[in-house]
């Protein structure tokens, strides 16, 4: 048997919009709109550059119903380029493709084999002693286990199953279409299962290989990290290596920054820039769509919260200073005030805390009760506000005491 390579890809979702990045600059919007096509082009170019014998596409080539028939024509042109390079394509249609009116009506080039919908069938590639088994979805909401009906392994060949499935333990928040289990697939006698549907890259087993390549291009903030396809090398009739190759055009990243060590915003932003530079470096020159969470207990909490828009502008400015083009998709503020520190002599601090509690109790109680009475008088008859009022009665004195301690603590820090 000759040695060769093949590519396993899935979930191309051609022309799928990237969510959460609308309303950016016109230049950015046009780049985002083209991201799935450019990732597809990268797939075609990788197969040609690596001299692959064939490409496996494990479903969801399209993103539901075609918004533009040009999407289908673009895909066919990519198949033609592979054919010109002597590369076969074996593909199945997934749940999104089955929602598409044109997916099974496109006039494919001769190098493309689309597995039928009625039943799982086999396709032989005699020159490399490979048998590929697969089945397309007959409808989008396929809930049956179709893997059990895949043909038995063909003796004397490398057997590959192509399946669009929510395999148990890896489905995440994906719909449970064509469910199966890794144990079931492992017992089928195939050498490699080329799976699709789940957008997270995963190798469920290596004996045999049961593999999700993940999707080709991340589409929103939950699809982070490198996206692409699997490049598989076959030597002496056996799977030798399975290597992920990143093909995405825009990289989604979720970052968390701990602000607890900072009480000066300029210093905080300097440290944040260092972190963001590392994020940009890991993207290998790709634009990064960033969801940033700033967390931790910091004295800056009130200022950051009250000046969120200005903070966002500062972070966008930081991103603009980095090499490449990067965007802040969302800023999440999860900071808090640090607990009030006792900066005085312990005996003095204890007496001061007790005095604060006494003064708050005496000063707030009367004012609070009068104010609650006014609120009750303004409520319409029958309003069920007792729980709300009791919560206010409980919370306000506590918050007043916390604020008083915080102010005293700040004075103590200032005195240091």
For the regions a protein language model found, what residue spans apply to each?
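N-terminal active-site segment of His-dependent metallophosphoesterases
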Residues: 1-71, 391-397
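His/Asp/Glu-rich metal-coordinating catalytic cores
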Residues: 19, 25, 54, 65-211, ...
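Short loop/turn motifs at secondary-structure junctions
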Residues: 3, 51, 189, 286-288, ...
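Structural motif
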Residues: 6-8, 56, 160-162, 194, ...
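Binuclear metal-dependent phosphoesterase catalytic core
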Residues: 3, 119-126, 213-278, 291-293
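Structural signal for conserved beta-strand scaffold positions within catalytic alpha/beta enzyme cores
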Residues: 8, 116, 134, 212, ...
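Amphipathic, non-transmembrane alpha-helical secondary structure
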Residues: 37-48, 76, 147-151, 269-273, ...
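Accessory, non-catalytic peripheral segments of nucleic-acid enzymes
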Residues: 247-416
């Amino acid at each position: 048997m000759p040695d060769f390579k093949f590519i396993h890809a899935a979930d191309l979702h051609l022309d799928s919009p990237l969510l959460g990045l609308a309303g950016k600059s016109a230049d950015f919007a046009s780049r985002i709109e083209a991201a799935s096509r450019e990732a597809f082009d990268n797939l075609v170019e990788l197969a040609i550059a690596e001299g692959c014998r064939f490409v496996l596409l494990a479903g969801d080539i399209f993103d539901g119903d075609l918004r533009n028939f040009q999407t289908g024509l673009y895909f066919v042109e990519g198949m033609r380029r592979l054919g010109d390079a002597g590369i076969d394509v074996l593909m199945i249609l997934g749940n999104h493709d089955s929602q598409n009116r044109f997916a099974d009506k496109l006039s494919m080039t001769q190098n493309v084999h689309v597995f039928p919908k009625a039943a799982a069938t086999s396709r032989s590639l005699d020159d490399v002693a490979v048998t590929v088994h697969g089945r397309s979805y007959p409808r989008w909401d396929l809930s049956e286990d179709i893997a059990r009906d895949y043909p038995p392994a063909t003796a004397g060949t490398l057997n590959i199953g192509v399946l669009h499935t929510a395999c148990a333990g890896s489905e995440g928040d994906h719909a449970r279409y064509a469910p199966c289990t890794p144990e079931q697939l492992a017992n089928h006698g195939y050498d490699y299962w080329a799976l699709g549907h789940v957008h997270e890259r995963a190798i469920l087993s290596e004996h045999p290989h049961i593999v999700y390549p993940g999707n080709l291009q991340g589409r929103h903030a939950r699809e982070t990290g490198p996206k692409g396809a699997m490049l598989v090398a076959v030597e002496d009739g056996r799977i030798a290596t399975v290597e992920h190759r990143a093909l995405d055009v825009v990289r989604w990243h979720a970052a968390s920054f701990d602000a607890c060590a900072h009480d000066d915003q300029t210093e905080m932003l300097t440290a944040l820039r260092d972190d963001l530079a590392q994020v940009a470096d890991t993207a290998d020159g790709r634009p990064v769509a960033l969801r940033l969470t700033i967390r931790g207990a910091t004295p800056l909490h009130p200022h950051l919260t009250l000046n969120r828009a200005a903070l966002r502008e500062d972070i966008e400015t930081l991103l603009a200073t980095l090499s490449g083009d990067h965007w802040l998709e969302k800023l999440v503020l999860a900071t808090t005030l640090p607990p009030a520190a006792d900066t005085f002599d312990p005996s003095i601090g204890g007496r001061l805390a007790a005095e604060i509690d006494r003064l708050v109790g005496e000063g707030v109680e009367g004012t609070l009760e009068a104010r609650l009475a006014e609120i009750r008088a303004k409520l319409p008859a029958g309003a069920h506000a007792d729980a709300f009022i009791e919560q206010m009665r409980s919370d306000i004195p506590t918050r007043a005491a916390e604020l008083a301690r915080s102010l005293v603590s700040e004075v103590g820090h200032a005195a240091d």
